[in-house]
Amino acid sequence: MKRFSNNIKNMKPRKDSKWHQGYVPNNLCTKLFRSCKDEPIIYRSGLELQFIEFCESNPKVKRWASEPIAIEYYNRLSQTNKNYYPDYVIETTDGNHIIVEIKPYNQTIKPAAQCSEWLKEAWVTNTDKWKAAEEFAHKHNAKFIIVTEKFFE
C-alpha cells in the first residue's frame, strides 16, 4: 500500500466547522498501527470519532490507522489524476484488511436531478474515489467499505 505523501495531516480540525472535529489523544488509541503512533489522530466528524471508538473497543479489530494510504484516482470533473486518502484502514484479528471511508448516509446516494451543482459534483468525485478504492482493495487482497451512521444502529 502506498504511504501518503501529501499534507493532509496538516489540515487541522476547525472550530468553526459544522462537523464535530478534534484530536484523539494517542494514549487512548491502543490499536494504532505502530508507524502512526507519532502522528496526531484527527477526527473530522462525530461519525469518525464513533468509528475510532468502535475500532478501539471491538475485539475483532487488531489494529487501525487514520488516513494512512494514498490511492490515485481519475477525477472526471477536473479530468486529472488525484490522490484520495481513505479515512481508515483496519486489520482484523483474522488477518483481513479493510479500507474504510466514513460518510453520512445521505452522501452515499445519488442526488436528485434538482439538487445543487455542488452536491452533484461531490457525488461524481466521491464515486470516482470509491471506484478507485475498490480496485485498489481488490489488487491488494483487501476490502473497501463505506461506513455511515447506519453502521452503528
At which residue positions do the language-model features occur?
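Electrostatic, structured charged patches in enzyme active sites and in nucleic-acid/phosphate-binding
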Residues: 1-153
